[in-house]
Regions:
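Chitinase-like catalytic core of GlcNAc-active glycosidases
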Residues: 2-16, 26, 39-169
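Short acidic active-site motifs
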Residues: 20-21
Length: 169
């Protein structure tokens, strides 16, 4: 016997998306993940180059949850696992980033956080897991759900930089 469960459908979009395409897509989504915010080496938030407020408004007008997507993109718009490493091993940077995220989400009206860190180093696996737990706890206290984007994994012992730094369990 199969149990019915509602599906949550997320869509990622850059703030420079054509507004007509966004409006056509929103009725099919549960959440709109605005792509993306990055961060600096010292833990400051890097917003998208194009204003994202209009997307948040469109999402809410269509009963879709707008989510801030935090990536490991650096100031050159490249995924940077050294940036992740530096963040994960510095309490002050983590606190600065979490504080900045909470402020940005409150100010702009985001209703959730999607974490999309690419290329977490294998040696950072446990530190990343602790960071996700801490970030989730802080966000949940403020009423924000947190999701983590993951590369598809086909086995427990799968090798590769997309998998080894992530504790899928």
């Amino acid at each position: 016997q199969k149990l019915w469960r509602p599906a949550a459908i997320k869509g990622y979009a850059y703030p420079f998306i054509d507004s007509g395409i966004l409006r056509q897509t929103l009725p099919y989504l549960t959440s709109l993940c605005v792509f993306s915010y990055g961060f600096t080496e010292d833990g400051r938030l890097i917003p998208p180059k194009t204003d994202d407020r209009w997307m948040i408004g469109e999402a809410k007008a269509n009963s879709v949850r707008p989510e801030l997507t935090l990536t490991s993109l650096n100031e050159q718009d490249q995924f940077d696992n050294l940036l992740i490493h530096a963040l994960l091993h510095d309490e002050e940077r983590k606190e600065r980033l979490i504080f900045a995220l909470l402020n940005e989400m409150k100010e702009k009206g985001y209703e959730g956080l999607d974490l999309d860190f690419e290329y977490v180093q294998a040696e950072d696996r446990d530190a990343y897991t602790r960071f996700v737990a801490r970030l989730t706890e802080r966000m949940n206290v403020e009423g924000y759900p947190v999701s983590v984007a993951l590369a598809p994994k086909t086995s427990d012992d799968q090798r590769g930089i997309l998998y080894e730094g992530i504790d899928y369990a």
